[in-house]
A protein has these predicted regions:
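Preference for solvent-exposed, low-hydrophobicity sequence contexts
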Residues: 61-259
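Nucleotide-state-sensitive switch-loop elements of NTP-binding domains
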Residues: 1-34, 42
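Phosphate/Mg2+-binding loops and adjacent switch elements
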Residues: 23-88
Length: 259
């Protein structure tokens, strides 16, 4: 399993490309032939960038293009005069029907609900944890008077201030606010919003850098300096990092939107 942060490649092209490469490399160690079924994102510059990155990273000996009316030709053009990879064009079977947006959403909800059906809420202490996708927890927590000073500068309630390699990071309460963001930029602060973590879908990364499982953040507990995370994993003892996603979801699979 590889967690890239969301169910759509849009906004996560680098993560999707690297994760695909990692999974294919592992599969190659145990199989004579590996077939990579890529996503349906094929249109526009984003689709071309993602597919080109996967081809360059995977270096396949053959690319099989399933298309209806030549919609993949723009993706295939760079390989027209190259000796590798070979390109085989196939027509999509007439019986194949594209799923609607609602059908895709309903399927995701069922899959999430099934995955988290037996989830328990486990504790992840901040002292032994890092975050991927945020500067929070990367620095040194500053004394309380730094919070009061930051509140005066930013105009919001600040729960924690850290000194990171890039300056000061303020953990703010409430919802994201553009006025606060502008003030932070002017005053040299980086702002992370505590509300970001509510129901956030995360990847639980073990000490070897592998995705051990998924979780949903139930609470960022400032008093006890810990995250409470719903996950089907038996234990979080080997978890070293939370890879923060960009979507929020409930245990029953209901998607709450982007973080």
């Amino acid at each position: 399993m590889e967690f890239v942060g969301a169910t759509s490649p849009v906004g996560h092209l680098l993560q999707c490309a690297t994760a695909t490469c990692r999974v294919a490399r592992k599969a190659s160690a145990a199989a004579a032939l590996v077939v990579v079924d890529t996503t349906g994102l094929v249109h526009g510059s984003i689709g071309r960038a993602l597919k080109s990155a996967k081809i360059e990273l995977l270096q396949p000996w053959m690319v099989i293009a399933l298309q209806r009316e030549g919609e993949l030709e723009a993706l295939l053009a760079p390989y027209r005069h190259r000796s590798e990879p070979a390109v085989e064009r196939l027509e999509v079977a007439a019986a194949v029907v594209s799923k609607t947006t609602e059908q895709r959403r309903a399927r995701r909800q069922r899959r999430f609900a099934h995955y988290f059906r037996g989830a328990r809420t486990l504790e992840l202490g901040w002292r032994s944890l890092t975050l991927e996708g945020s500067a929070f927890l990367s620095g040194r927590a500053m004394p309380g008077h730094f919070c009061a000073y930051a509140e005066g500068k930013l105009g919001c309630e600040v729960a924690r201030v850290e000194r990171t390699g890039n300056g000061l990071l303020a953990l703010a309460r409430g919802e994201p606010d553009r006025t606060v963001q502008r003030a932070a930029h002017q005053e040299g602060y980086e702002v992370e919003w505590l509300s970001r973590f509510d129901n956030l879908l995360v990847g639980l990364i073990d000490r070897k850098g592998e995705t051990a499982g998924l979780g949903i953040v139930q609470k960022a507990d400032l008093e006890k300096q810990r995250f409470l995370v719903a996950t089907p994993l038996e234990s979080t003892e080997q978890i070293a990092c939370l890879r923060l996603g960009s979507m929020k979801v409930l245990r029953d699979g209901t998607e709450l939107g982007e973080a």
